[in-house]
């Protein structure tokens, strides 16, 4: 039964958190489309790439290879087999292709089909994702982390005035495709607009526009409005356009042409009102001075009648000479460009003037020269090159996201499927940039989540697969030309190696393919929900600035502002918020409830950062009316465009779905997070991921209600796949018979769940499952069947609930040190199991095969005491450093034999051949018990006794599972048939399976009789008198036969694989893996932490009698330093301690009441503590005995849930403290265990959830007496891994000098370090008892001399 927690939440639970790893699973499912029929597959993922690359045509157009469909085979091994054998869990991919050959008529050039060949071709294997969202690669579980990347599209920015000393803003734009050339547009300090393609040399943007087919005149008309100027009676008149004229001053009086009235005097500023008057008066032109006309620019070329060349080309600046020439030639009307220096500057006109290119052909050639300087172009080559650069969908891809972004930015209506650039994209993009420079529009914020998208697993693998396919395409084209196509079949052309190599490289070595963090269930879930800005195509740590790393307003509800690593990756690796999801375009969406006129609708919508911009969003904890259906009247605090504003509730359009919507899963596991400083909250949420699963788990008394979701979705716990009945339970497996067949993925209706026992995780912690269900119980979909590591009752349980006192204790909790009660060690409270795996391989060497054997030369029998006859350590053996785990001998090189040895060889045969001991031994620092040994032998090699024994045990286990599954199936059919015949009268005597009388003739048949009769005898009984019965029985039998066959085939396949040899790496004959479990108790030096960033190291484990104790004699478990709280500002831990104290004492009260069998008092107590719904969930349907049992099971404390941002108030905690019978201030009188005296002040005491972290002192501490030396310097190596020594550095030398210990120092620096001769002499002298020190020269001095000689400086030692 699911645990009921006392929940302090006030907000309605409108939306359950989604499945926490659905992002990974959905993405990869969409990539493979494995469950869809070929004809139903959409053009995404694998289908899209294959359709994109195929058809592949040869260079002469004589043959074509077309893609028809793809299909998948069955995985060769199960996930568990892959992990044991070090294989990859993958699925074979086959494609059906058609090879068409053509005949070409040489005269007409018409193609006719000569031949068509269709064939299914193997295209390599693809890694398959497990149900938990991980990939098994070479036996290890890996996660593909999603990447946060700048979205493709069009972006505008400026340099913040940093490029030039004047501080002038230089604007730029960039068009980023997914595949293809980048376009950069940028203004220089002189306001000339340049373009760069792929960051090459820049050239004027007008060259690019002319290459698109625009003439200079068309370009000017695109960028500027036109003004009409005419000359009459020696005066210049400019056409009146209200928008252009507003804000200017009149040079002459403005006269109404109809009645001559002066509407405005000269010198007056033209207002909007005056513009309206002028329009009403029908004024078409206003008078302008010649000075005004000077400096304007001609919009079109002016050509005299009959002349070929224009008098003045367009874009000519008007000077006095130009005006005189125009008047002389009788040109009284012309068009100019409107430039006011505010909304329309001269920059584009100026750029066009600097551009020497005139025609489209010249522009194309110029661009070709810039990008391909070496080869001389022809117009045809240049045109094709330019078309391929941006407009060929095969070579340039904006992706749907890029197209969507460009359409949104420029207001275009281009079809979303059109993924190459268009002329409009470029011209409107340039126009937007010119307007931007003229202060119209705004730049893009690159850290806005509307401009950053997530590339999930599916997309990352898709990109990799495309690279492999492109390589394969090249190879296919070459083969088509080199070989005779008529005789070829498709499989002769297709070689899947480039694809397999690309996929292997990605999964094995990519920065985004990571070794899964498997320390506990939470670290698994968090790793799968992680987003990284690093990796190929992303940022690098060195170049990422502060802005990219910082929290952005659009992160709200999408990316957690708290959970990110400390150190160089801060802000670059982040976590998805609890309710967030990724939409098909890769943008992160978060759910909101729709609000209209203050009424909250049932409609929940997911909005991306861009869609959210125009909305006004209220928080989840906003004041509601009594019916909880609408928001209260008045002002409230809401969010709009990233700002927090106060606004009337009538204006709200959406509201949050949950208070913890903005934070990640790990952060939402911290109770009272709202009372912690952000830095400590970050540490708290990060350190939970490092907690080691303990031997005995306990869920936190003070939780947040999120614990069960993490346990449910991590895959650590075993859940029921559907409704059914538990048939059988033991410590190794659970058998469930489901009501409907097909629930468990097989069409049998029976599932044997084999629990994972003592499996090594990636971080060497122990992964083991414990059943929590009883046989005969009914289960529903999602019912907990077994708890995983670090879980209890289906909830995450990473630590222990400890009674904590905040007080100094004789300096042992100085600087965050922790004082621990020895009782915790006796109770194994913080004991964890860690599993190491050691493996060795017997290889086939040049000198002969290595052999795994117990027969090892020159080794005592005592050393081999734990090995069996095959030379492999027995399971259950206790081992310590240096013990032999697997005996192995390697042949030595052939030596020249003496006559005596030849004689021995002749007498004793090969046995006397030289072999050396290369056994696998336990490394330093490892002690424990051998829990398993696995032997893998190459196919065709005889298996040893141990291999056969392991194989027999495994086959026996599988046969047992098969029997149980068939028995459950039979019982199910018997029950079904029993229900069918129940109530009918027996036509004759019916015997049971043992042959004894069960039902006499004429008696009524009941359901239970069917099982007693037995499955096989049921069908021999005459049921002819019952209508429809025989047919239905036959159908049931037929179904049983089919289902039994499915079960038999499945198990037989696994058993067959067990009997076969194993696939081992080349040259390996046999491989042995030995698993050693180590029990780690809590010890001094271990790191512990709470959930609020309060971490420390165990400084002393104090005997129970010396610990501070309460008046009733109970001792506290742990003593923490009170000074660790105020400066860290993580007050959440104090609130947790108080609430935990209330929870614990309520449990103690329930225990007393249970002992007194006071059922009514228990119910009264529970009704005061819990809400009505929680109370009924606990009490309803329970007998008095069950209520007592419930109370007794909760004797250690009642479980509370205080959700983040919606948790327990101070008054509620006080109320519970009073209810639990302790001081409402949460302080108690403690007594000193050493003296028995009471402490002077009251002490804050309570219950805190403390974790043991993965930084265990046993893994870090290390000492050496003798060991390996460095070859060059002859000094001991450094570090635990190398079994190195302790470094005696320069500071230590100074210390020795300060004490004047010259001889000791000399000994340190010579014979104890790298004086080779001195070392040997010293050893001899100690052996002979002549302890007198003589030293030589340290080896490092010789190294220094050699180094100097390398610099051509000869140095000789003069010994006198």
UniProtKB/Swiss-Prot annotation:
Matching entries from Gene3D superfamilies are given as:
2.40.50.100, 2.40.50.150, 3.90.1100.10, DNA-directed RNA polymerase, beta subunit, external 1 domain, DNA-directed RNA polymerase, subunit 2, domain 6, RNA polymerase alpha subunit dimerisation domain, RNA polymerase Rpb2, domain 2
Broadest EC class assigned to this enzyme = transferase
Does Transcription appear among the keywords? yes
Q: Check the record and name the PROSITE patterns matching this protein.
A: RNA_POL_BETA
A single cellular component GO annotation = DNA-directed RNA polymerase complex
* UniProt family annotation: Belongs to the RNA polymerase beta chain family.
- In Swiss-Prot or TrEMBL terms, this protein is called DNA-directed RNA polymerase subunit beta
User: Where does this protein come from, organism-wise?
Assistant: Desulfotalea psychrophila (strain LSv54 / DSM 12343)
Q: What does the record give as the organism's lineage?
A: Bacteria, Pseudomonadati, Thermodesulfobacteriota, Desulfobulbia, Desulfobulbales
Gene encoding this chain?
Answer: rpoB
